[in-house]
Amino acid sequence: MNTSPKQSGYLKVGNGHEVYFWTAGNPQGKSALYVHGGPGSGTDAGCLKYFDLDTTYVILLDQRGCGQSKAVNPLLHNTTQDLVGDLEALRQHLKLERWTLFGGSWGSTLALVYAITHPQVVEQVFLRALFLGREQDWAEMLLGLGKLFYPYEHQTLLKAIPQACRTDFTKFTNYFYEVLQGNDSALKTQLANAWVKWENTLLSPISYVKDEKAEDANFTFKLALLECHYAKHHSFLKPNFILENVAVLKDKPVHLIHGRFDLVCPLSQALELKRALPTLNLYVTNNAGHSGSDPNNLTTIKHLLKTQL
């Protein structure tokens, strides 16, 4: 599989931000935008594993403040609405009339908000590990379900912060947010590592999924900072924005693959979306968690993209 970029460059989107984009696959094939997670994960060649590059033209973008994108200040002018605007600016820059979206975890949030905002240019939506992006969803990931399965690992996370901030989501995120923007380099590193290590603990019920990028101190810090930024601000969305507006997609094919044992984005969120969008094609994968690399998730995603895209 040739994963070399067909086209790459920077798109100036204003307010000191330049977002990096690249494409791969067949330019004459069906256009599919890969929307990465995090926020803050960025893109790399591994993101292409889901696609048939002989028949698909894959477009990838590093969201504001991460990957190879450039920013004067990564947190200023970095909201969900800004990211949606960047995706639309990229579509226009590439002169694509319509495209299909594929996003997992936070990428599913952003893909849905984009599709709700610009339904006229969206062919289909493929989602993995749905994340609705509400305050309660962030709180569940950081302080909720996972601690029942990994209590010792969760205690390690909590021990990194003052006791008064360990059970209240607002105090928890405020403390991380303040420290990660502060001047104590050692403490910033400690908290960023604790945040990302906890998230990685929850990725897969089958075995510990090693994210090699997480060993990169710069990547780890950016990921923790941007996730905390979006968690603190409840994804910059009104409560239940997706559920209350997703009906605009009722006439479009929307597919969701969700691991039954996802501890980052519990299956209950997928069921909420199904109730709000009865036409949703929901595929629950057994013996699978959050990671797109879990065998049952990966096999299902590749099959759907190959047969439905």
From Swiss-Prot:
The keyword Protease applies. GO terms for cellular component: cytoplasm. Coiled coil: none annotated. GO terms for biological process: proteolysis. Pfam families: Abhydrolase_1. Keywords: Aminopeptidase, Cytoplasm, Hydrolase, Protease. It comes from the Bacteria. Its EC number is 3.4.11.5. Its main location: cytoplasm. Belongs to the peptidase S33 family. This is Putative proline iminopeptidase. It comes from Mycoplasma pneumoniae (strain ATCC 29342 / M129 / Subtype 1).
